[in-house]
């Protein structure tokens, strides 16, 4: 496990923090939010994914969300999945509950090829979106959420696989 420090953490967000480790993008990587817990089985499943972009999602989210927040119809980590298991949209604020297939967990796997795609998209958009919204969150590119990055990948035609778990 390697740790990286984003010296600009106070004026940026998670994607820019993630990209401080770009010198390590020479093989597949697992990326995890620092505030989540997951089982070894979940980690192994993610590690064994053959997809370029793999995202752990919780398909059994409603009970937990109701308990935690008292409602289930808000958030920016909701997502929709097509019949082949690929995410078609995510990060929409307050989507209709019947349009939520799962919730984003914060555990991802990117192949080496995927990492190069991420850098290409990031570098192409970086200057243009310094002072205007980049994706659905309305944040500038330096303050982008990981869901913004995933949404950018989907918009650019990349296939982002939802790796489903019950609980997450």
Predicted regions and their residues:
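Conserved alpha/beta core of the MobA/IspD/sugar-nucleotide pyrophosphorylase nucleotidyltransferase superfamily
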Residues: 97-168
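Short beta-strand-to-loop acidic/aromatic patch adjacent to the donor-nucleotide binding site
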Residues: 27-37
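Conserved core of the sugar-phosphate nucleotidyltransferase
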Residues: 40-125
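Alpha-helical elements of Rossmann-like donor-binding domains used by nucleotide-donor carbohydrate transfer enzymes
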Residues: 20, 45, 148-149
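Conserved beta-strand segments of alpha/beta enzyme cores
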Residues: 2, 86, 159-161
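Short loop/edge segments at beta-strand edges and connector loops
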Residues: 5-7, 33, 57
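Conserved glycosyltransferase catalytic-site signature
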Residues: 14-15, 36, 143-148
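Conserved N-terminal catalytic core of the sugar/cofactor nucleotidyltransferase
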Residues: 1-28, 140
């Amino acid at each position: 496990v390697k740790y990286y420090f984003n010296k600009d953490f106070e004026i940026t967000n998670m994607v820019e923090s993630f990209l401080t480790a770009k010198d390590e993008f020479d093989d597949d990587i697992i990326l995890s939010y620092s505030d989540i817990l997951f089982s070894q089985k979940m980690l192994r499943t993610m590690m064994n994914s053959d997809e370029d972009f793999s995202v752990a999602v919780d398909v059994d989210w409603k009970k937990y969300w109701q308990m935690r927040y008292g409602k289930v119809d808000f958030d920016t980590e909701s997502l929709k999945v097509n019949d082949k298991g690929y995410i078609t949209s995510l990060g929409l604020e307050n989507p209709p509950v019947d349009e939520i297939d799962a919730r984003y967990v914060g555990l991802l796997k990117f192949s080496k090829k995927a990492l190069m795609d991420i850098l290409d998209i990031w570098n192409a958009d970086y200057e243009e979106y310094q002072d205007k919204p980049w994706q659905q969150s309305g944040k500038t590119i330096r303050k982008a959420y990981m869901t913004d990055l995933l949404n950018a990948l989907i918009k650019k035609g990349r296939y982002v696989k939802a790796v489903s778990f019950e609980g997450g």
